[in-house]
Regions:
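Structural signature of Gram-negative outer-membrane beta-barrels, strongest in the C-terminal barrel
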Residues: 2-144
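A generic beta-sheet turn/junction motif
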Residues: 130-132, 168, 177
C-alpha cells in the first residue's frame, strides 16, 4: 500500500523591462511524504484492513506487516528567464531553472527507498517566424546538471528506481514550412 501526500505553493512574476524585453521570475516550494506499507497478503490482508489499515495506531503490530517505510522531502526551486524580441517575429531567450522530484520507495516484497532528484537547467534559444510567416523555426541549446537523477531499471519483473549523478547537454530544433 502506498500513500503519498504532496503540498506545494508556486508563483511567477513578469516584468517588462522595455517594449521588447521581458523578465520572468518563478518560485516553487514542495513538501512530500511518501509512505509504503508491505504485508504478506492472504488472510492477513483482511486482518490488516479490519484493524484500520494505514490508520492503525501501531502499524508494526498489524498481523502480516513486513515493512513500513516513510520518505519525507521538501524542496525550494526557482526560475529566472529573460526574453528579447529582436524583431516582431524573432525572439531570443535565456533561462535558468531548478527542479526537484521527491524521494520515494521502490515497490515489491522488499521495498528499498530512493533519494530525491535535484536538477539545474540552463537554456538558450531562438523562436522565429521567417519567410513572411511561411517558416516556423525554434532552436535551443541546454545543459542539465542532475544530482540524484532517477533512472528506472528492471529487476526480475519489477521496476526499480536508482539515483545517479548526470550532466546532459543538448540541442533541439524544430522547423516547419507551411
Amino acid at each position: 500500500h502506498v500513500r503519498i501526500k504532496s503540498q506545494a505553493i508556486y508563483g511567477e512574476a513578469y516584468y517588462d523591462i522595455n517594449d521588447t524585453t521581458k523578465l520572468t521570475l518563478g518560485f516553487r516550494y514542495d513538501d512530500l511524504t511518501n509512505a509504503t506499507t508491505t504485508f504478506n497478503g492472504g488472510l492477513l490482508a483482511s486482518n490488516w484492513i479490519a484493524a484500520g489499515g494505514p490508520l492503525f495506531e501501531n502499524r508494526m503490530d498489524v498481523p502480516g506487516l513486513t515493512s513500513y517505510l516513510v520518505q519525507n522531502d521538501s524542496a525550494t526551486n526557482g526560475m529566472v528567464a529573460i526574453q528579447k524580441y529582436l524583431q516582431d517575429d524573432v525572439m531570443v531567450y535565456a533561462s535558468y531553472t531548478t527542479a526537484s522530484k521527491g524521494a520515494g520507495v521502490n515497490g515489491g516484497t522488499d521495498p528499498v527507498p530512493y533519494d530525491q532528484e535535484d536538477t539545474g537547467v540552463i537554456d538558450f534559444g531562438i523562436k522565429a517566424k521567417l519567410l513572411d510567416g511561411a517558416m516556423l523555426l525554434n532552436m535551443n541549446v541546454f545543459q542539465n546538471d542532475n544530482s540524484g537523477m532517477l533512472l528506472a531499471t528492471i529487476r526480475n519483473t519489477e521496476a526499480f528506481n536508482i539515483n545517479v549523478d548526470a550532466e546532459v547537454t543538448g540541442f533541439e530544433g524544430l522547423m516547419k514550412v507551411f
